Amino acid sequence: MDSGNVVVCDNGTGYVKCGFAGENFPTSVFPCVVGRPLLRYEESLQEQELTDIVVGAACADLRHQLDVSYPVTNGIVQSWDDMGHIWDHAFYSELKVDPSECKILLTDPPLNPVKNREKMIETMFEKYNFAGVFIQVQAVLSLYAQGLLTGLVIDSGDGVTHVVPVVDGFSYPHITKRMNVAGRHITSYLVDLLSRRGYAMNKSADFETVREIKEKLCYLSYDYKREYQLGLETTILVKSYTLPDGRVIKVGTERFQAPEALFTPELIDVEGDGMADMAFRCIQEMDIDNRMTLYQHIVLSGGSTMYPGLPSRLEKEMLDRYLDVVLKGNKDGLKKLRLRIEDPPRRKHMVYLGGAVLAGIMKDSPEFWITRQEYQEEGLACLRKCGQA
């Protein structure tokens, strides 16, 4: 079977990355959104023919005329009808494949409900009639993309952040940490921060605009208190941004206040540990033989790890915790800890890249894939081939 017949599809909360096995980057990346025309626009826009359902990037251009819904929330599919439209768009419009002649590798966040996987595999066989399907945990794929089998993956996308220890290609679900703070929540927090500054932002229509502001201007401070002080006393942090309608707004301390929620989720009223705490606790809960290897291979993955300053901030926080908790303040011991944070430049599409590598290697080994025949004979029991969720 040639690589053109193996589809890789990483459906995230914010974007769908899809392409073919063995490729170096996704063929198509489009926002995971579905829009339906608002009634009042249906009559008035005769010359601009609106289809019944708009998927992906087209939603952004027409967003004032559409009722936009996001089928995936926090990594879990909430609306399977809408997800069907997204997959239709991916397979037929973007990749232009005939599913019945292809195999597909899908991804799933760790600690996702089993129902999510079951419904996914059911749709792939019943609706699209794929020849073979495999579902892999996202974190493991990120490591494959980095050429590792053992490491600690910190994956932060649009809907969910998780920290997953992987040893020899197996993840540990009982030690995996998950936090519902990621890209979408930071954008939404930035909307709040900007409205406190006096810029009225509409939650839905301006959401994309604010996301662009976030991607262009936000960063993580090395020392939050000092940076905040600097922001209050000087104007050195203020940057201007031109909105699509020509207005210019100034963004100051908000640039690092918004992403700070990744490290201190209390800022947006989410209980639990921040990214550094999760990573540290995760490694300390592993058995002692694996800890040092994990400290040396902390791999960042996903779009919300792209903030400038995030790797150095994470390193500082982890060293502080190690010094306090493990070494009880004895600094000599830090020399032995070779903490290394890997931040590959293409980490935004890391899960997809790992999927393309895995699918490329496995495309000809029948024992790897769940075949249509197995699904028809065993039903959902065939999911055991995919290992643990």
UniProtKB/Swiss-Prot annotation:
The keyword Nucleotide-binding applies. It comes from the Eukaryota. InterPro entries: Actin, ATPase_NBD. Its main location: cytoplasm. Transmembrane segments: none annotated. CDD domains: ASKHA_NBD_Arp2 (cd10220). Keywords: Actin-binding, ATP-binding, Cytoplasm, Cytoskeleton, Developmental protein, Nucleotide-binding. Belongs to the actin family. ARP2 subfamily. Functions as ATP-binding component of the Arp2/3 complex which is involved in regulation of actin polymerization and together with an activating nucleation-promoting factor (NPF) mediates the formation of branched actin networks. Seems to contact the pointed end of the daughter actin filament. Regulates the directionality of cell expansion by regulating the actin organization, and thus the microtubules distribution and the fusion of small vacuoles. Component of the Arp2/3 complex. This is Actin-related protein 2. It comes from Oryza sativa subsp. japonica. The gene is ARP2.
